[in-house]
């Protein structure tokens, strides 16, 4: 199964956990925007607290699940690992795959603040309740 494709195309929105400089946890909702078969990519604006936290500490955990009618129709993925800031690299691919970003950031100046990250190393857990017994699998990202 292509877990990265499930994460980007079926789940898309996830809750991301980071820690601040004092070790306090923070969570954010964000979209997993693109995958290349090896890793997943996302972006944030350089004026947001999330950007600062990711630049200071690359450790991240996230969880997301598909939004279907009932619990037994859902799949979930959790990732724990390290992200890497890659600046504007692949920004065009992320924007092309997620055209709603042009509504959120309608001007070139607004989009100039967007910064791309990807997982450089992570362990993932996949859980599928659409079949019984539930299917579970572990996978790794070595971006």
Where are these regions (language model features)?
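Charged, amphipathic alpha-helical segments
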Residues: 1-2, 44-50, 100-103
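A short, Trp-centered hydrophobic/proline-enriched beta-strand micro-motif
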Residues: 6-21, 60-64
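Short connector loops at helix/strand junctions that flank enzyme active sites
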Residues: 9-11, 27, 35-37, 55-59, ...
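A short, aromatic/hydrophobic, helix- or strand-capping loop or linear motif
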Residues: 18-20, 64-67, 106-112
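A structural signal for short hydrophobic beta-strand segments in well-ordered beta-sheet cores
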Residues: 32-33, 83
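A short mixed-secondary-structure module that forms the rim of ligand-binding clefts
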Residues: 33-71
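Charged, gly/pro-rich active-site loop segments
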Residues: 75-143
